[in-house]
Amino acid sequence: MPQQIELRNIALQAAQPLVHGVSLTLKRGRVLALVGGSGSGKSLTCAATLGILPAGVRQTAGEILADGKPVSPCALRGIKIATIMQNPRSAFNPLHTMHTHARETCLALGKPADDATLTAAIEAVGLENAARVLKLYPFEMSGGMLQRMMIAMAVLCESPFIIADEPTTDLDVVAQARILDLLESIMQKQAPGMLLVTHDMGVVARLADDVAVMSDGKIVEQGDVETLFNAPKHAVTRSLVSAHLALYGMELAS
């Protein structure tokens, strides 16, 4: 399995250019946070990595490398990169139970799909009464439960990399804390490389090792999390950090 995945000069376009020459490097055992406002190109960059661009959007430049060798997105999806989606309710087939979703995921990747394996993954993400959970349909579960189920399926994939696209969006504070605890636990136990897409600098401060800031389809600043919080350079980065510090009655040093 690769130890590093690199996005090199990725450019995306629809009727007009959307993402301009984005380069990112994911490394095993490290969390790279991709931050920026809505419409900055974060989710499109993830979609390009996985080969699931929306209709009408095409990649016009750039490549993806695994340990320095060019690779297609379809060769990464699932086997090498697991995904935790922004809106878990839309990610599940409403006609299938959690058992069917989990089992089909495992079988598609050639992983064990016995009930003991599925139960262990569900228990690992803190969902009580795994036997009951496996019988549930998506509409019978809360947003927090579905997000934890998404994480359980990412665990089942045993992929060396994870893309987590706004994993705490639209969840209440308690559910958000539980999701962050789970992601932190996965990093400690499995040490994947993680691309964490978020607009929440509190999430960045807690989980990230490195940060890339996007604005208008471009990476405007990159660095380790400590440097970015203590000495942000770009105006967008300074605005994000200042807004985060203001929540605690603090100000960014001039």
Curated annotation (Swiss-Prot):
Topology in the lipid bilayer: Peripheral membrane protein
EC number(s) stated in the UniProt entry for this protein: 7.2.2.11
Domain ABC transporter intervals: 2-241
Annotated S-S bridges: none
Residues that bind ATP: 36-43
Enzyme class: translocase
GO molecular function: ABC-type nickel transporter activity; ATP binding; ATP hydrolysis activity; nickel cation binding
GO cellular component terms attached to this protein's record: plasma membrane
Subcellular location(s) per record: Cell inner membrane
Catalytic activity: Ni(2+)(out) + ATP + H2O = Ni(2+)(in) + ADP + phosphate + H(+)
Family matches, as SUPFAM superfamilies: P-loop containing nucleoside triphosphate hydrolases (SSF52540)
Similarity field: Belongs to the ABC transporter superfamily. Nickel importer (TC 3.A.1.5.3) family.
Functional summary from the UniProt entry: Part of the ABC transporter complex NikABCDE involved in nickel import. Responsible for energy coupling to the transport system.
Protein name (record): Nickel import ATP-binding protein NikD
Source organism of this protein record: Escherichia coli O157:H7
UniProt gene name: nikD
